[in-house]
Curated annotation (Swiss-Prot):
InterPro entries per the UniProt record, alphabetical: Phage_gene29
Name listed for the protein in its UniProt record: Gene 29 protein
Superkingdom to which the source organism belongs: Viruses
Length: 147
């Protein structure tokens, strides 16, 4: 059951904005039908990101309508860019982590000009082993004469 704006528990992260996520508009104004479990997960996710609905914020106000910043919620999670691969919205190496979690060290591709001969041979052997270099030839393909 998806709670309504009037019946939801605004202090429950899983219900806080669940009501607002139902029937989100899609193409031609048709509303998206989504399982309530997903809506609850998304509501909790937004809560952890620090989002709060205006009705919840109004409850924090004093008699003059003021809210001190110390009363506002803390963000608990942050988005971490992909630690490997392309910087793309479709790269599943991206993730949500604790807001104070350190970012992983970026992966550095070695400059083969700075490697020793032994290190380069080891790299070539790995590429041959895994099929990236065919025929045991580390060099470029050579043209053939066909008669």
């Amino acid at each position: 059951m998806i709670p309504s704006q009037e019946s939801h528990n605004p202090n429950d992260p899983r219900q806080h904005v669940m009501w607002a996520l139902r029937n989100l508009p899609m193409i031609a104004g048709v509303g998206a039908i989504t399982h309530p479990g997903y809506l609850a997960d998304w509501s909790e996710h937004l809560w952890k990101c620090g989002f709060r609905h205006v009705d919840w914020l109004r409850e924090l106000a004093d008699e003059d309508g003021n809210i001190h910043v110390s009363q506002l919620p803390d963000q608990e999670i942050k988005f971490q860019q992909p630690f490997r691969g392309q910087r793309s919205d479709y790269n599943n190496a991206a993730r949500w982590v604790g807001k104070d979690d350190p970012d992983p060290e970026p992966v550095r591709i070695p400059d083969i000009r700075k490697l020793t001969d032994q290190e380069n041979r080891a790299m070539i052997a790995q590429y041959e082993r895994d099929g990236w270099i065919k025929d045991g030839s580390p060099g470029p393909a050579i043209a053939e004469v066909v008669e």
